[in-house]
Amino acid sequence: MPPKAAEKKPSTGGKAPAGKAPAEKKEAGKKTAAAATGDKKKRGKTRKETYSSYIYKVLKQVHPDTGISTRAMSILNSFVNDIFERVATEASKLAAYNKKSTISSREIQTSVRLILPGELAKHAVSEGTKAVTKYSSSAK
């Protein structure tokens, strides 16, 4: 005859009975406290790199009295990451088509022309050329 529902013992799933669990936790807590004091190295907080500071600087150059919300900054950061990835991928494909192992400014410029539409591509190319020229002259 099968046991009644009230008579069934709850399955512990291979764990210790509930009565002994607090004592084990205390011991484990003491061990971790001792280990944290000097045995193991603490992990630092992982840094997440964003374009937030650069976006903020550009915003202040264009509109000094305007602020930006955290959500808007997050959206702009995602946008910059997306465009960067698209340009890098396209430049990589162009270098592979031309059997080159190095991505140069020429591949970047061509990929920008392919990805961005019309007038936006022209402005991006001119600003990029200006930035590269400024960098080259200051590096000498």
UniProtKB/Swiss-Prot annotation:
Residues 1-48 are annotated as: Disordered. One of its GO terms (molecular function) is protein heterodimerization activity. SUPFAM superfamilies: Histone-fold (SSF47113). GO terms for cellular component: nucleosome; nucleus. Pfam families: Histone (PF00125). There is a cross-link at K8, K9, K25, K26 (Glycyl lysine isopeptide (Lys-Gly) (interchain with G-Cter in SUMO)). PANTHER family: HISTONE H2B. This is Histone H2B. It comes from Neosartorya fischeri (strain ATCC 1020 / DSM 3700 / CBS 544.65 / FGSC A1164 / JCM 1740 / NRRL 181 / WB 181) (Aspergillus fischerianus). The lineage of its organism: Eukaryota, Fungi, Dikarya, Ascomycota, Pezizomycotina.
